[in-house]
């Protein structure tokens, strides 16, 4: 019931697992049997569907690894990119990179094979790492929204220091590690007998108490509220107030108008990141909630395929974020180009910003120093 993982195999009935394992015409012993009813066939066992799933997962992995690695690289390499907001964005990229490397390959393997082939240790570690990475992403997006809200709406002159930002990032990982710990603790690596003399290996959740323990449902619902509903509420409130503030704010002077445009672009970029995350994860969260409320959802003919499709949609957020940074933010776009050209300084591609303009800008800023200074600086990424 964690945020990601192939739960379809863990909740199937014996009859469903039989159909998946042996296909339409043979038993484990190679005996011919009558064709099963069409509605019992699992679509994820069809070669055409498997090819599509492999292409989809591999594309997401490739785009996610390249994009998120590039975000991390430019923040580390270029000193001008080492701002508090960019540290949070880089932390988001680290979490997404972990999802690309720890979630997708194992989930795809589990989906295609129909049983757990990675051993007992990874049975406990993989779901934990998956939950940890997703929760860090959610908390980081919330932190970014609160940081922008603090600086822009309240005009606070005291900015968060880099040391404090690292402390916040550490807390995000610590809280996520604690919240994801049940995914590693309440796990069972076991053999399940499908028919006499035939068993498969399964990696399933094992909560204390009776077979259908309420603890699993409570954990799943709590995760939905704490790591999806509540963050989305906070993020939506923060960005609504930011949008209202930017809409009503008027900056004097040409230089401040330039910064006002940058503020708007930055806010749009961050809002798009949040919207992409929310929309991409909504189908999977809603589907898992439906399973918790009504277990008959597990009896759907295409439960496994539906789960896999929603999982793919959720994973698209891991490569969408770097695309948003590159497309909507000029700083990242220039940093990406500079990284591809193997340039050592980001300033080398700031050709449109002349020394004369910089001097003029500094002079205007000094003349217009006042309450708006903190407002201007706070919105630059």
Swiss-Prot record:
Region: Disordered, residue numbers: 1-35
CDD domains to which the protein is assigned, alphabetical: 7tmA_NPY2R
Swiss-Prot/TrEMBL keywords: Cell membrane, Disulfide bond, G-protein coupled receptor, Glycoprotein, Lipoprotein, Membrane, Palmitate, Receptor, Transducer, Transmembrane, Transmembrane helix
Name this protein carries in UniProt: Neuropeptide Y receptor type 2
PANTHER family: NEUROPEPTIDE Y RECEPTOR, NEUROPEPTIDE Y RECEPTOR TYPE 2
Gene name per UniProt: NPY2R
UniProt source species: Homo sapiens
Disulfide bonds listed in the record: 123-203
Cytoplasmic side: 73-86, 146-165, 238-268, 326-381
Compartments reported by the entry: Cell membrane
Residue numbers with lipid attached (S-palmitoyl cysteine): 342
GO molecular function: calcium channel regulator activity; neuropeptide Y receptor activity; peptide YY receptor activity; signaling receptor activity
Transmembrane segments: 52-72, 87-107, 125-145, 166-186, 217-237, 269-289, 305-325
Entries under SMART domains matching the protein: 7TM_GPCR_Srsx (SM01381)
Tissue expression from the record: High levels in amygdala, corpus callosum, hippocampus and subthalamic nucleus. Also detectable in caudate nucleus, hypothalamus and substantia nigra.
């Amino acid at each position: 019931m964690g945020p990601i993982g192939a739960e379809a195999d863990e909740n199937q009935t014996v009859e469903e697992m039989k159909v998946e394992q042996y296909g339409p015409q043979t038993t484990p012993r190679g005996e011919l049997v009558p064709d099963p009813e069409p509605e019992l066939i699992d679509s994820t066992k069809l070669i055409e569907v498997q090819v599509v799933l492999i292409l989809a997962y591999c594309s997401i992995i490739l785009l996610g690894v390249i994009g998120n690695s590039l975000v991390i690289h430019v923040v580390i390499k270029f000193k001008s990119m080492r701002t508090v907001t960019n540290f949070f964005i880089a932390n988001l990229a680290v979490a997404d990179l972990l999802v690309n490397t720890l979630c997708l390959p194992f989930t795809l393997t589990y989906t295609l094979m129909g049983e757990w082939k990675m051993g007992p240790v990874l049975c406990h570690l993989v779901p934990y790492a998956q939950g940890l990475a997703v929760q860090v992403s959610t908390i980081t997006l919330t932190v970014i929204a609160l940081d922008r809200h603090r600086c822009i709406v309240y005009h606070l002159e005291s900015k968060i220091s880099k040391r404090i930002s690292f402390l916040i990032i550490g807390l995000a990982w610590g809280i996520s590690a604690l919240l994801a710990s049940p995914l590693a603790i309440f796990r069972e690596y076991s053999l399940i007998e499908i028919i006499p003399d035939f068993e498969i290996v399964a990696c399933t959740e094992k909560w204390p108490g009776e077979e259908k323990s309420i603890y699993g449902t409570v954990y799943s619902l709590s995760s939905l509220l704490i790591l999806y509903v509540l963050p989305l509420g906070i993020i939506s409130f923060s960005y609504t107030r930011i949008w209202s503030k930017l809409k009503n704010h008027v900056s004097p002077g040409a230089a401040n108008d330039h910064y006002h445009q940058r503020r708007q672009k930055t806010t749009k970029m961050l809002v798009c990141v949040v919207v992409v995350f929310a929309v991409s994860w909504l189908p999977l969260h809603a589907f898992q909630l439906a399973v918790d409320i009504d277990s008959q959802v597990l009896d759907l003919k295409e439960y496994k395929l539906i789960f896999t499709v929603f999982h793919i949609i959720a994973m698209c957020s891991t490569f969408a974020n770097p695309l948003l940074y590159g497309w909507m933010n000029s700083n990242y776009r220039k940093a990406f180009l500079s990284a591809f050209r193997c340039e050592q300084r980001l300033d080398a591609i700031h050709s449109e910003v002349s020394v004369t303009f910089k001097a003029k800008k500094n002079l205007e800023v000094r003349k217009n120093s006042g309450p708006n200074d903190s407002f201007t600086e706070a919105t630059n990424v």
